[in-house]
Amino acid sequence: MPTRQNNVLGHTNSRKPYHTKNHVEKTDTLIYALGGLGEVGKNMYCYEHENEICIVDCGVLFPGDELLGVDYVIPDYHHLIRMNKKRKFLVITHGHEDHIGGIPFLLKQVQIDAIYAPRFAKALIQKKLSEHKGLENTKIIEINEDSRVSTRYFTVGFFNTIHSIPDSLGVLITTPNGTIVHTGDFKFDLTPVGTNADYQKMAHIGVLKPDLLMSDSTNSGVEDFSISEK
């Protein structure tokens, strides 16, 4: 059943997390989405290894007419609440609402050790948090394509991508069990506004043969080319 909170709808999921094995080993790296799969919005992806969880994005979904009176839908954070003893850090790929809109609601329920965001997204998040009592002074660490985040089990690097908003990043996540490329939202634009995509870095990542690609697929079924931002 969905739960309503101040015109925000939180989706609950009674199904157990899906695993390809009958049981989970302590040394396994778990990957799961709390939103964003099969829908446009509510993007939130988790990469978990032992006592650490790397969260990528935390957005909202803008509902259709079937949810009259609901401003937006947020992911179900109950799994992260249950895992509150584990260390968690949040990485933001860009500043669209479907990737940052759920952050205030997450911070009110889940302990997050650090938030990393590119410059423009950082400014948008700070403005958003200033409207929520108790979250005004939340520290956000600015990142760019040259940044690196290292914890006990994760090493996270970044590369520039092109999107319809400035400062959009893709993410390279190295875990004890392999390497993951998380693209974030992207498109190929040969005449972009601002910084171009890191095609050379993308090619180098391909040479490294990552184990898993978590790719944006919005409008991938539409023929022809994307319109340039310029």
Question: Where are the predicted features?
Answer:
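N-terminal acidic, proline/glycine-rich, low-complexity intrinsically disordered segments
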Residues: M1-L9
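His/Asp/Glu-rich metal-coordinating catalytic cores
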Residues: G10-V91, H96-K230
